[in-house]
Amino acid sequence: MYLKKYNLKNKYALVTGAGKGLGRACAIALAEAGCNLVIVSRTKRDIDSVSKIIKKLKVKCKSYICDVTNYNEIKSIINKQSRIDILVNNAGNNIPEHFTKVKTKNMEYLVKVNTIATFNIAQLCAIKMMKLKNRKKVGGSIINMSSQMGHVGGPIRSVYNMNKWGLEGLTKGMAVDLAKYNIRVN
């Protein structure tokens, strides 16, 4: 419904966190615009549900169950693709805890999911995008899903704030580095 006026036919998008929420909505909207999809989620039931909807829209859809913090697993998925034009880097998580009560294991997990995995996926996809012979002509897009928490502080969200502020900086740096390849980063 949302992207029907856009023509993304013959484009290929990778969407992480595609099983629920924003990732699911983005994957379906891209498919409605004619985009072929590679969707990634941690849970089989969620990814199967989204895949079923996308396939009804008569676009190609490959689905993978994957924990994005597993570098080798996500790298393998990305390397299997012949082409990626769009990345919706959406996978993420939050464990609300008061700053003074943040458990180290929770902080490390959130940094791994929200920052390190996001960086790794963006880097792997950017490298794949840059290899396309006519990339400068056809362009590419990387969308790093942030949050208002990347701009303001919030209660019981210190670690999430930290991750999203870092993501904002990463996105700006990537935009500068990838502009000469006509890869837009937002």
Annotate each PLM feature.
Residues T100, V152-S158, K180-Y181:
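Active-site loop immediately N-terminal to the catalytic Tyr-X3-Lys motif
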